[in-house]
Amino acid sequence: MSVQENTLPQQLWPWIFRSQKDLAKSALSGAPGGPAGYLRRASVAQLTQELGTAFFQQQQLPAAMADTFLEHLCLLDIDSQPVAARSTSIIATIGPASRSVDRLKEMIKAGMNIARLNFSHGSHEYHAESIANIREATESFATSPLSYRPVAIALDTKGPEIRTGVLQGGPESEVEIVKGSQVLVTVDPKFQTRGDAKTVWVDYHNITRVVAVGGRIYIDDGLISLVVQKIGPEGLVTEVEHGGILGSRKGVNLPNTEVDLPGLSEQDLLDLRFGVQHNVDIIFASFVRKASDVLAVRDALGPEGQNIKIISKIENHEGVKKFDEILEVSDGIMVARGDLGIEIPAEKVFLAQKMMIGRCNLAGKPVVCATQMLESMITKARPTRAETSDVANAVLDGADCIMLSGETAKGSFPVEAVMMQHAIAREAEAAVYHRQLFEELRRAAPLSRDPTEVTAIGAVEASFKCCAAAIIVLTKTGRSAQLLSQYRPRAAVIAVTRSAQAARQVHLSRGVFPLLYREPPEAIWADDVDRRVQFGIESGKLRGFLRVGDLVIVVTGWRPGSGYTNIMRVLSVS
């Protein structure tokens, strides 16, 4: 808020509906301390009574209307209520702790939007059963069309990874790798099942060609660190920098090294075919290093999987450096901080996270923030303070989705972890500096002749100017909803669609609440449009987005089919 007394900041007026301007002036200008003082003291109830419900149903309003980012921070209020409806989607990994139908129902109630299946573990039979359970749990809510919650299913590929061999004592044995000792890293087949404390076999045959003297080799998520001293005919002679206990089949990372592994392994191809056969909605493509890796996944999905969204996981230095070309051919990005924190220095991970989220926001593509978000909740009922801040800052950075891994796959508190992410996200979303965010996104938007894109940015701007409580969009493929999400409206985007897959996939986009409309089309198309819009309004009222008297922006097409969105209306909820 401006510190001038008895004047309302000019930048505030675009946020206040024209018919409310005179009322706002009379309510604020005569207050002690002027408008700024009034807004700092007034309760939400007072503001709601004087300026209308829709404008003030979102919280942290004084901070959201601040003139500068520093002032925005100063005006954040810990006693302000969180937003009514969470906009950031929650991805939960499904595993032994969460794959039962009853537990999945609890997680859906708690706020899970996307169920992730990690194909680094488990057989196809195991994952087929998990998919069946997820769908059964989801459909158990279908008795009420207005409260039905579509849940997307994501397949996370194993990806092109490097692993050690089996130790001499068998798959369950372990050996101690002692700091300062010498270890031979070899590709000689005779050591594939005969590893020990002095010799470690790896399954990457070109390792001697790509790793230089002085380079590092990390084993088992970086717990063991080796420094290359010499490259010989038998392999790499290394010195142990950090020792530890080594088991069989552990992951190997080669930081700052461009490896020439194929983008897809044979197992990945089988897994992708499985995903197409079981109608998964999203592919999380692991260890993407360049654009051609993404195109290989698209080719593997084939015509039957052409509508599956591909989210590229950035987990290595090469992927970060080639981020723009990867983003261009991907449907979205996952900031996979686990392996990324091994491949690049841990203190630089936050830089990579902010860079990738920012570029995704500018490109209008979904971005997921993942790994160790609430790691302590694997064994504890409450997260650490640092973890809650990490989740909140991912939301403030602009992530569309936040992900839980071991917390829900194997943890003791999977439902509580989802509930905690839900609560943190609601608080963080209220603290977003929407005014600055929309202005920057609008300025950065290139000129466009695409009617759908132009209509989307106009609808978001109109939602700010008339203080709309929601934007209702009728969509066939979900593209219109994603374009609206791109400009980050404060209003909820209620996406009404007849496509079950589109309803599930729009969870990737922030602030979009999908509604699956199951009624058959009306004979007269205009009547069908009105019925779907009314369905969106009734659902919004049921979920608390809308109240009688609120304004909503309605975005529709001028004819049936996809690609014809170009009509925007303003309606009052009755």
Swiss-Prot record:
Keyword set includes ATP-binding: yes
Regulation of its function: Allosterically activated by fructose 1,6-bisphosphate.
Pfam families xref list: PK, PK_C
UniProt pathway annotation: Carbohydrate degradation; glycolysis; pyruvate from D-glyceraldehyde 3-phosphate: step 5/5
Keywords: Allosteric enzyme, ATP-binding, Glycolysis, Kinase, Magnesium, Manganese, Metal-binding, Nucleotide-binding, Phosphoprotein, Potassium, Pyruvate, Transferase
Modified residues (Phosphoserine): 2, 19, 26, 43, 292
GO cellular component: cytoplasm; cytosol; plasma membrane
SUPFAM superfamilies: Phosphoenolpyruvate/pyruvate domain (SSF51621), PK beta-barrel domain-like (SSF50800), PK C-terminal domain-like (SSF52935)
Record: residues binding K(+): 118, 120, 156-157
Catalytic activity: pyruvate + ATP = phosphoenolpyruvate + ADP + H(+)
Site (Transition state stabilizer): 313
EC code(s) of this entry: 2.7.1.40
Binding site for Mn(2+): 315, 339
Binding-site residues, ATP: 118-121, 163, 250
Subunit structure: Homotetramer.
Family: Belongs to the pyruvate kinase family.
Name of the protein: Pyruvate kinase PKLR
Species per Swiss-Prot/TrEMBL record: Rattus norvegicus
Recorded name of the encoding gene: Pklr
